[in-house]
């Protein structure tokens, strides 16, 4: 491992815009220390909520807590029901008639694209991506086939954790534009039929958030103090793991102003909110109101397991946390109808399934599957994937896994055994510079050796296994990374739009860019960029567009069951996705060599496999094993068709 980076962590905001540069909206709002009192903050939210309207009946109210501030987490919040059930921020005809709008389960058929406003496209030429820039690129995303966007945090923040350190939940970071710019972006996305979800950083704030600044000065035991988790000694919750071990030694940090320790699961500049305090829960519901009234389609719930702490536990996924998620879901559903909650919970599958029982989240990222896709590619055998699929716990019919290969963080190896982690590090991060915490800070293409066949295979699995695929911006063109940037900025470099100035990301002076563009020779923006790939019919980008278009023809991929198909070659993975009379056979060769496989497809005897891409039909399936050959890292998607159109019942 590289030398510990704890000091780096405290400096990591350097070179990036700071909140003070970005004109903090809270200063001057009143209060002796320049910080708005919470009640005033609540009033502001009420005034600004959604479209400049006062808080609607039925939304959360910030009432003074009962004395002592603690409270029973299972207690029902003070919420008055409201009759409105809106679609896209406006009551629909049904809602206006008082009828709930039936859920569409749109997220099951979605193709989600994770995008960082900061590094996607600079619309005003100041070197930093912004909402004007993102809006200008919506046509590109639509043509790619994307149907939903997930935006990383774009709120006012000192950016010491790239926005996951929120200083104001209900505004836009000035570097990214205005709330008006956000509204225009949302309207334009909706006009193209795209949904938008954003990160909701529930667990913690920045130390610069007015709530923390007030808490640290407040009297111990007071309602303001109790917005965060304090202790006189760092001995509470001993043994709870540190999530960023390269940067932090402990989950407690001494605050000289409060003269107490505060709890933080992530960086020391990210104090955990105290969800035992009903005021915190209400405050977060007001944040939810603010964005949903604007018409947002849902939230990625960041760091969801860590909301509550209890002595003697791992302080993760506690019953109290699930109780709060249920309240959050019920609150949203009663007021806004179908808005999606996507859990970011880096936990084993059995734990994840607890969020997916129908009354908490709609989706959860499949953290156990992701590293096993990479393990299967490294070992060139199907077993690691099969193991996850066989052990997969049941989830409610309306729920869905969110599948991903890469995201804005390190490729986290928290969900594999220490031996598997070592194996993955050896296979994908031989250079210690590529490692961070318990993971690997590399993008998809460098991880897979820029090998086009392996990239296509990885995408073919992402788009055919049960769940909704999530693409990380830039991975559609096989962008590289910069492991010499601090922390996870390695994988957050500017989008490469062209071979021109600043990769087409910005017209600014190159020295003013929010992050350097990639110039590593194999991934240099002059070679790897959208413009060049759009012009090349065989580019990765055009190939992926075709793959997405094919997936969209078959609802079985988003909504169907999974049937594993037995074969006689451990290097080949085979399964059928079924929905009604639609059945798609997926066969994937994990090895770099040609493979043959005999598949037990007796249940489909009589069916004709038709290639979903080219339409060629193979000989009919018989009761005896069906023989297929696959090229290196080859894969097939076959539509199983009976001559008379009937597909047999599942076994
Ligand atoms: O807001 C703090 C962090 O929350 C998310 O972290 C998640 O990613 C971590 C890896 O970087 C992972 O170890 C942890 O279990 C997750 O909660 C968010 O995605 C991070 O960017 C952020 O720093
Ligand atoms: Ca800009």
Residue ranges and their predicted role:
Residues 2-6, 12, 16-21, 25, ...:
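Active-site and adjacent substrate-binding regions of carbohydrate-active enzymes
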Residues 30, 71-74, 80:
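Compositionally biased, low-complexity intrinsically disordered regions
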Residues 40-41, 47:
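Compositionally biased, intrinsically disordered low-complexity segments enriched
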Residues 54, 64-67, 100:
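Cationic, low-complexity basic patches in intrinsically disordered or flexible, solvent-exposed regions
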């Amino acid at each position: 491992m590289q030398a510990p980076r704890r000091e780096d962590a405290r400096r990591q905001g350097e070179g990036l815009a700071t909140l003070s540069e970005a004109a903090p909206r809270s200063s001057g709002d009143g209060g002796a220390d320049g910080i708005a009192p919470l009640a005033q903050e609540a009033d502001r939210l009420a005034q600004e909520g959604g479209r400049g309207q006062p808080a609607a009946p039925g939304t959360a109210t910030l009432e003074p807590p009962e004395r002592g501030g603690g409270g029973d987490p299972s207690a029902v919040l003070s919420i008055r029901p409201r009759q409105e059930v809106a679609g896209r921020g406006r009551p629909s005809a049904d809602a206006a008639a008082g009828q709930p709008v039936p859920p569409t389960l749109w997220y099951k058929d979605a193709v989600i694209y994770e995008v960082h406003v900061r590094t996607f496209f600079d619309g005003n030429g100041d070197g930093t991506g912004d909402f004007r820039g993102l809006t200008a690129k919506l046509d590109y995303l639509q043509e790619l086939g994307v149907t939903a966007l997930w935006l990383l945090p774009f709120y006012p923040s000192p950016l010491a954790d790239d926005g996951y350190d929120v200083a104001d939940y209900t505004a836009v970071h000035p570097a990214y534009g205005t709330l008006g710019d956000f509204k225009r972006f949302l309207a334009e996305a909706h006009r193209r039929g795209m949904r938008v979800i954003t990160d909701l950083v529930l667990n913690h704030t920045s130390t610069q958030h007015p709530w923390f600044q007030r808490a640290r000065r407040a009297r111990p035991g007071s309602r303001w103090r109790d917005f965060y988790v304090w202790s006189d000694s760092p001995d509470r919750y001993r043994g709870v793991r540190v999530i960023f071990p390269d940067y932090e030694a402990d989950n407690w940090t001494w605050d000289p102003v409060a003269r107490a320790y505060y709890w933080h699961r992530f960086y020391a500049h990210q104090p955990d909110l105290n969800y035992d305090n009903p005021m915190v829960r209400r405050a977060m519901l007001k944040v939810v109101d603010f964005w949903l009234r604007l018409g947002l389609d849902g939230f990625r719930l960041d760091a969801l397991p860590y909301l509550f702490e209890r002595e003697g536990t791992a302080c993760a996924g506690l019953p109290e946390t699930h109780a709060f998620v249920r309240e959050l879901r019920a609150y949203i559903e009663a007021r806004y109808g179908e808005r999606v909650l996507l859990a970011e919970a880096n936990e084993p599958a059995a734990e994840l399934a607890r969020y997916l029982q129908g009354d908490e989240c709609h989706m959860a990222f499949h953290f156990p599957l992701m590293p096993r896709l990479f393990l299967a590619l490294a070992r060139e055998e199907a077993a690691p994937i099969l193991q996850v699929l066989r052990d997969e716990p049941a989830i409610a019919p309306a729920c869905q896994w969110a599948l991903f290969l890469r995201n804005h963080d390190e490729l986290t190896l928290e969900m594999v055994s220490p031996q598997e982690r070592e194996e993955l590090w050896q296979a994908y991060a031989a250079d210690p510079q590529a490692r961070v915490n318990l993971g690997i800070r590399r993008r998809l293409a460098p991880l897979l050796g820029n090998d086009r066949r392996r990239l296509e295979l990885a995408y073919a699995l992402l788009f055919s296994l049960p769940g909704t695929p999530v693409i990380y911006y830039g991975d559609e063109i096989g962008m590289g990374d910069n492991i010499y940037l601090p922390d996870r900025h390695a994988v957050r470099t500017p989008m490469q739009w062209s071979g021109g100035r600043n990769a087409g990301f910005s017209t600014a002076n190159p020295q003013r860019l929010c992050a350097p563009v990639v110039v590593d020779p194999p991934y240099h923006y002059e070679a790897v960029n959208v413009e060049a790939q759009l012009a090349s019919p065989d580019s990765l980008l055009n190939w992926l567009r075709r793959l997405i278009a094919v997936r969209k023809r078959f609802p079985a991929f988003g909504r169907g069951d999974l049937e594993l198909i037995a074969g006689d070659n451990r290097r080949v993975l085979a399964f059928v996705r079924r929905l009604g009379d639609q059945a798609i056979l997926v066969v994937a060769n994990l090895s770099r060599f040609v493979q043959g496989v005999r598949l037990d497809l007796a249940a489909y005897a009589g069916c004709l496999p038709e290639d979903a891409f080219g339409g060629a039909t193979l000989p009919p399936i018989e009761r005896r094993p069906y023989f297929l050959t696959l090229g290196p890292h080859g894969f097939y998607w076959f539509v199983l068709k009976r001559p008379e159109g009937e597909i047999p019942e599942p076994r």
